[in-house]
C-alpha cells in the first residue's frame, strides 16, 4: 500500500504559533521532539511539516487515516546516521495491520513538505 501527503509549511507555522508545545505533544513522540529541539525556527518548521506529512502518508497507506485505529503517536519518524528518515512503528500497529516492511521518503520544496510511505502487509 502507498500513502502520499503534502503539507504547507506556513500552515504548520500557524498551528505551532497558536498552540506551541501542545501541538508538539499531540503529533510528536519524545524522540521526535528531541530531534527538533535545538533546530533554528525555520528548520524546525520544515522538519515538523515533514514529520506531519509522513504520519499522514502512513495513515493513508494503512487505509484508515488518523482515527481510532491509528494515531499520530503510533509511528515515529526518525533519522538514521546519514540523515535519511525511517519509521519506528508501534508493535500493536504492526500486529493489527500485519505490516512486514515499511519505507518513507520526505522532501521539502517551495514552502511545502511532501512524504510518501510504502507498506508491505501480509494478508494473514
Curated annotation (Swiss-Prot):
Belongs to the P-Pant transferase superfamily. AcpS family. One of its GO terms (molecular function) is holo-[acyl-carrier-protein] synthase activity. NCBIfam families: acpS (TIGR00516), pantethn_trn (TIGR00556). Its EC number is 2.7.8.7. Mg(2+) binds at residues 5, 56. It comes from Campylobacter hominis (strain ATCC BAA-381 / DSM 21671 / CCUG 45161 / LMG 19568 / NCTC 13146 / CH001A). InterPro entries: 4-PPantetheinyl_Trfase_dom (IPR008278), 4-PPantetheinyl_Trfase_dom_sf (IPR037143), ACPS (IPR002582), Ppantetheine-prot_Trfase_dom (IPR004568). It catalyses: apo-[ACP] + CoA = holo-[ACP] + adenosine 3',5'-bisphosphate + H(+). Gene3D superfamilies: 4'-phosphopantetheinyl transferase domain. Its cofactor is Mg(2+). Transfers the 4'-phosphopantetheine moiety from coenzyme A to a Ser of acyl-carrier-protein. It is found in: Cytoplasm. Keywords: Cytoplasm, Fatty acid biosynthesis, Fatty acid metabolism, Lipid biosynthesis, Lipid metabolism, Magnesium, Metal-binding, Transferase. GO terms for biological process: fatty acid biosynthetic process. This is Holo-[acyl-carrier-protein] synthase. GO terms for cellular component: cytoplasm. The gene is acpS.
